[in-house]
Amino acid sequence: RQIYNNTKKPITFSDIGKPLEVRYNWEGVKKDIDVDESQKTLWRYRSVLPKVNNIISLGEGYTPLQQLAPDLYVKNETVNPTGSFKDRGMSLAVTLAKAQGVEEICLPSAGNAGISAAAYCKEAGIKCHVFLPETIPSEYKKATEKNSKNVYLSGKTISDAGKAMIKKKVNDWFDISTLKEPFRVEGKKTLGYEIAEQLGWRFPDVVVYETGGGTGLIGMWKAFVEIKSMGWVNDPLPRMVAAQSTGCAPVVKAFQERQRDTDFWENSDTVALGLNVPGPLGGAWILDILRESKGIAIMIDEQRLKALTEEFNNLTSINSSDEGGVVWGLSLIHI
């Protein structure tokens, strides 16, 4: 384990090439619930986020928790500024990057992260380089180009786009790829804080999460553990469930085979663009959380995704992308 105390310069990997996690000195301390009620964004939880003076925000977070049945809720992240939960992570990552003097940022994306990064970097005055797969629908490229003139296309998957980025990257570009810096997880963890608050400071029994790179699952689990350690909630921790498609399911395969880490998923192909992550950097971290929480990893038949997504959207009026079909399919199984 390595410890880094200097947050005044950009933080990426550890020296051994592994993701870093933000830790706070809260052990043994019972804190009163500290939420800024005046904030209707994720920054209402500023007391449990890294200390910064100048926040880069577009109004992300504090999204609806919609009840579908007496014991079933869905978190509607489509109402975030650029239409996805990626805005949570980007608000934190870009805020910290700006505070640390970063002038240019780069990342590969399957779609939504690139759109979000470009928007937040424009707000911060940071140049943003986004690498997308050539197969991405044109509307994602256009939405990214709305806020960044530096958009590149390469390969069929986010892994291919990442390889192209490595070839083109120059030394002063700060890489905010999934888990290559620690603060996107801090933004995503606010999902967990919001869910607990919206349930009246209680935990759900189970959280089903559509899992590509996994920062949302990692972030929510981090939030639940923090909340319990501070004494804000005394319920048992939730079971975490990773939902994937049969078109790309490295986490499910590794979980079923009791592996410590994921293997690269060859020839990945799914209409759920955010799940087309054949080699998740945080694979071992995700698997640890699933086992610690007594959770599971399950995949839904790729051929059913379109129909499941349509059914979900008709029921909720959320207009979810196809990742929503994966979660809806698992919710029908009664995990």
Model-found features: residue ranges?
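PLP-dependent amino-acid enzyme catalytic core
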Residues: R1-I333
